[in-house]
């Protein structure tokens, strides 16, 4: 993968993260929580309507998670723009370390909470970032050999 393509893919993944986080925050602010109610219900199959996003605790956790996603997306975008663009090895290392740390802790805790499906949902999200980094790293290594 060309470096410019990897940069565009990482910017896209960052913006997608920001949008997903903003959707969670807006759901809390507006009270339009139905899409997230379905999402949480899907975490604990079968789809039976038992999970919700209605209590104060659930709403504040959604707000916190959304804010963290927005913050991570902004940070990933800045790392991509100011570090990865000029130093793909360093920028890729920073992003990869953060993403793998998130993936392992989030997935392990989700599994422990009985929401094993979240591990499956986390995986494509992780790959949105890791695939461009890895393919660019592989291309750079092949060009330098």
Can you say where each PLM-predicted feature lies in the sequence?
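Cytosolic juxtamembrane helix and N-cap/initiation of the first transmembrane helix
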Residues: 1-27
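Short juxtamembrane and helix-loop transition motifs at transmembrane-helix boundaries
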Residues: 27, 53-59, 77-90
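Short, charged juxtamembrane terminal tails flanking transmembrane helices
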Residues: 1-3, 137-145
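Membrane-helix boundary connector in multi-pass membrane proteins
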Residues: 104-121
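Transmembrane alpha-helical segments in integral membrane proteins
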Residues: 64-83
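Membrane-helix boundary elements
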Residues: 19-60
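Alpha-helical transmembrane segments and their membrane-interface exit regions
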Residues: 43-44, 124-136
């Amino acid at each position: 993968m060309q470096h410019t393509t990897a940069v565009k893919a990482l910017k896209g993944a960052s913006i997608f993260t920001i949008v997903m986080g903003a959707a969670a925050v807006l759901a809390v602010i507006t009270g339009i929580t139905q899409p997230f109610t379905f999402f949480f219900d899907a975490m604990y199959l079968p789809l039976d309507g038992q999970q919700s996003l209605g209590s104060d605790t659930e709403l504040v956790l959604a707000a916190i998670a959304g804010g963290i996603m927005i913050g991570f997306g902004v940070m990933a975008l800045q790392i991509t723009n100011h570090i990865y663009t000029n130093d793909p090895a360093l920028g890729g290392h920073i992003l990869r370390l953060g993403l793998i740390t998130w993936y392992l802790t989030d997935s392990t805790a989700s599994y422990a909470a009985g929401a094993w499906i979240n591990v499956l949902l986390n995986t494509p999200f992780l790959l949105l970032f890791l695939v461009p980094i890895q393919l660019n790293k592989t291309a750079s290594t092949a060009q330098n050999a």
